[in-house]
Curated annotation (Swiss-Prot):
UniProt catalytic activity: ergosteryl 3-beta-D-glucoside + H2O = ergosterol + D-glucose
General function of this protein: Ergosteryl beta-glucosidase involved in the ergosteryl beta-glucoside (EG) catabolic pathway and vacuole formation via hydrolysis of EG to generate glucose. Is also able to hydrolyze cholesteryl beta-glucoside and sitosteryl beta-glucoside to generate glucose; and C6-7-nitro-2,1,3-benzoxadiazole (NBD)-GlcCer to generate C6-NBD-ceramide (Cer).
Residues the record marks as active site: 515 (nucleophile)
Other remarks in the entry: Present with 1070 molecules/cell in log phase SD medium.
Biased amino acid composition, Low complexity: 601-622
Protein name from the UniProt record: Ergosteryl-beta-glucosidase
PANTHER family referenced in this protein's UniProt entry, alphabetically: ERGOSTERYL-BETA-GLUCOSIDASE, PTHR31308
Effect of a null allele: Resulted in the accumulation of ergosteryl beta-glucoside (EG) and fragmentation of vacuoles.
Lineage per the UniProt record: Eukaryota, Fungi, Dikarya, Ascomycota, Saccharomycotina
One example GO MF annotation: steryl-beta-glucosidase activity
Gene (name only): EGH1
């Protein structure tokens, strides 16, 4: 079974003996954001109220994966050398029928998914992700069930009329099934995150994190809505965890499930806004209809407003022609009659001061309608805070304390993964009771230029993290020029994120990039016609370059089993999947079979002894071994490898140190010249060296018979079954460089193509 993961004194993942390990994998699978029955992708048009009326009757079974297909998907991931899965699930999938009404059939399906993953070639490490985007599917994203919006007094059926949220579903022609109008006129690229700045999402997050402070009148069944929502959310998560342990305790005992992440990409809502009558200067994303908070309040009450519109330009977001929105009598809030019916259905009893058919921020005196018609903002600074850290160090910590305590009551040894808001440092928890030695910090990173423009710009890049965190006196200083500098800038950003996280949580807490990736529908989906994924390859290689330089573990966003060239990941026009069934016919693998070893020419370049599982050589770490009960004469996972359907495979398939007998110092894979450099500090041991460093060396880049290896010390064995190099090196500072020798220009001594490194290795 997979070995238990430990954390070293300097915050690195390691085994029980202190040998550092690296976690690499994917998010599997974004289909969990949408129901499977009925299949309700975001390109399913909303034609009538059944979208809302039947929301409590949906089922998510078969999302993330159809059970019978699990083995083939996991073998594909193992073909990349991956050992880790981030398994998202949504609150809606667990509790869509109503508060406390759990879908145990779906939970049991998840148990079966986990069990089947664990049975495939020794399984994978898996951690659970309570996923959300802009609060809910009904506010333009994914996550919370519909009843949470009703709980806040919202009428989601009127979000379109009041601009309280933008849903992709409203921009689909029911007759043609296609989007209405041109992309930038109807549903612009990456417009869905603007919901974070619209009435529905901002209100829900404000209530979730700060309801007791900002909405004291909003109590339900004797609880403030903050406690009510957090309690239901945490209970749903822990009910799933308990169900897994009840039905399949071996998933925990075998180190298959390694931990739980806190809420995906939490948001502060209105908390911290200093003036509700203006768009905050620090807001970098302005696209499409962009109301101020006060304008959102008015629109939610059915009041006509003229608001700013922004469009995407080469130089950023530019203000365009204002537009007037007339809700035509519709409100974003439940009428008295509607709310009475909802409250009766869910057995809710509200505070008598909580009036229906009215904005809750008007209810709390933030604004009012004077003389029966004129809206007036009374408290523009109602949500302001003394400094920008108040939310993360107070409101967020209050929430995190709740889930931390519940999870630690459930299990003391599993990892708990704390995730702060996107591109922001975590709270300062040093010396806190809710920071223990099984805590990990989650970071997410997407290159701003690549994400928003869906292209790989080799000329201009932006230090997104530095810009968001005000590390520049002038935004112009965040601009970088040239592809090499852009790559270095991304590496610097990831390093800064790690540094900032450790400054808040301490050096002993590992940093794990639980989401990082690129859009594949670049350049208006040109690659889907030409099969030229060079832009995607360059963008992904830049991320790989950045991650491996700092020994950062990661799970790419994402692997989507239902991806298509037309609709991408079937959610809000996102297309991040590294694999697509539509790309399977385009792949012809000429390197899938294990090559027959050839003797290396005599030279100062070290030769490599190859072995198979029959040879009795030292085996790779447990999570890439074949099952103990599997006949070793049978094909191993890598010999079954299936690389068809992967996009930008050259950049995804990378060498990396699976387990280091010592401590990591530096690594770099050069995709252009097919070379890999690893520097480490070998562990000092009094005995003869018997424990190697294991390095995944994929045949896709490195044909075993043409490996050129130089190192500072030691000898090696290459296991062709597993594509793993076992390097037995000396203690202290060591390096190894592995190159793929060109057929046309063999790497002979003294040639221009060789890299002269200080020492030769012992030939095994």
């Amino acid at each position: 079974m997979p070995a238990k993961i430990h954390i070293s004194a300097d915050g690195q993942f390691c085994d029980k003996d202190g040998n550092e390990i690296q976690l690499r994998g994917v998010n599997l699978d974004p289909s969990v954001k949408i129901p499977a029955k009925p299949f309700l992708s975001t390109h399913a048009p909303i034609e009538n109220d059944t979208f809302f009326e039947d929301a409590d009757k949906v089922s998510f079974i078969n999302h993330p994966l159809v059970l019978d297909d699990i083995e083939q998907h996991i073998i594909r991931l193992k073909s990349l050398g991956y050992n880790t899965i981030r398994l998202p699930f949504t609150w809606e999938s667990l509790e869509h029928a109503g508060p406390g009404q759990y879908d145990f059939d779906y939970m049991d399906y998840i148990v079966e998914v986990l069990t089947r993953i664990n049975s495939v070639q020794q399984g994978m490490y898996i951690y659970l992700d309570p996923h959300q985007d802009v609060w809910s599917r009904f506010s333009g994203g994914s996550g919370a069930p519909l009843w949470t919006l009703y709980c806040a007094g919202f009428q989601p059926a009127n979000f379109l009329a009041t601009d309280a949220a933008i849903l992709h579903n409203y921009y689909i022609d029911p007759k043609t099934g296609r989007e209405v109008g041109k992309d930038e006129e109807s549903y612009p690229k990456m417009v869905w995150p603007t919901n974070y700045f619209k009435l529905a999402c901002q209100t829900m997050f404000t209530l979730f994190f700060g309801g007791k402070q900002y909405a004291p009148k909003c109590t339900i069944n004797g609880e403030n809505i903050q406690d009510y929502l957090q309690g239901r959310f945490n209970d749903a998560i822990m009910t799933l965890c308990a169900r897994i342990k009840e039905k399949a305790p071996e998933l925990f005992e075998s180190n298959c499930i390694i931990g739980l992440e806190s809420m995906n990409e939490p948001n502060c809502g209105y908390i911290g806004e200093t003036n509700l009558d203006v768009i905050p200067k620090e807001r970098n994303l302005k696209l499409g209809k962009t109301p101020t908070a006060f304008q959102s309040f008015m629109l939610g009450e059915g009041i006509e407003c003229t608001i700013d519109q922004y469009k995407r330009t080469f130089f950023g977001f530019s203000k365009g022609k204002p537009c007037t929105i007339n809700p035509k009598g519709k409100k974003a809030w439940l009428s008295a009659e509607e709310r009475d019916a909802i409250d009766a259905k869910y057995n809710w009893e509200r505070n008598p001061e909580w009036k229906p058919d009215t904005c809750i921020w008007k209810l709390h005196g933030v604004w009012e309608i004077q003389n029966g018609k004129r809206p007036v903002l009374l408290k523009p600074n109602y949500f302001s805070q003394p400094d920008a850290t108040v939310f993360i160090n107070n409101h967020f910590v209050d929430y995190y304390t709740g889930i931390y305590n519940k999870f630690r009551e459930f299990d003391q040894e599993l990892f708990i993964i704390i995730q702060p808001p996107v591109m922001k440092p975590p709270p300062n928890l040093q010396n806190s009771k809710i920071l223990d030695n099984r805590t990990i910090c989650a970071c997410h990173f997407y290159d701003g230029m690549t994400l928003m423009y869906k292209t790989w710009n080799k000329r201009i890049g932006i230090d997104t993290y530095g810009l968001v965190n005000k590390k520049y006196s002038n935004p112009a200083f965040a601009v970088v020029l040239g592809e090499n500098n852009i790559r270095k800038c991304i590496r610097k950003q990831l390093s800064e994120m790690q540094k900032d996280a450790k400054s808040m949580l301490g050096k002993k807490v590992p940093v794990f990039f639980t989401e990082i990736g690129i859009p594949f529908d670049m350049d208006d989906k040109k690659a889907y016609i030409t099969n030229d994924y060079s832009s995607q390859t360059a963008a992904l290689d830049a991320l790989g370059f950045a991650l491996e330089g700092s020994n950062l573990s990661y799970t790419l966003w994402c692997y989507c089993s239902i991806n298509s060239h037309i609709w991408g990941d079937n959610w809000n026009n996102e297309d991040f999947s590294i694999w697509s069934p539509d790309d399977k016919p385009l792949y012809h693998d000429t390197r899938a079979k294990t090559p027959t070893p050839e003797p290396s020419p005599a030279s100062t370049v070290a030769s490599v002894s190859t072995s198979t599982s029959k040879s009795g050589s030292s085996q790779p770490p447990s999570f890439i071994k074949p099952d103990n009960h599997l006949d070793l004469d049978s094909p191993s996972c890598t010999l079954k490898s299936d690389l068809s359907g992967f996009r930008a495979l050259d950049a995804i398939m990378r060498p990396f140190p699976i387990q280091i007998h010592g401590r990591f110092e530096f690594a770099e894979f050069n995709l252009c010249n097919k070379s890999y450099l690893l520097k480490l500090v070998g562990k000092t041991t009094p005995e003869q060296i018997t424990v190697p460093t294991y390095i995944f060396i994929p045949r896709h880049h490195f044909t075993p018979s043409r490996l050129s290896i130089r190192s500072s010390s030691g000898h090696y064995t290459y296991n062709t079954d597993y594509q793993v190099l076992e390097w037995f090196h000396e203690p202290g500072h060591q390096f190894i460089e592995i190159c793929a020798k060109s057929k046309s220009r063999p790497n002979t001594p003294g040639s221009d193509t060789s890299n002269d490194l200080p020492a030769e290795c012992v030939i095994s």
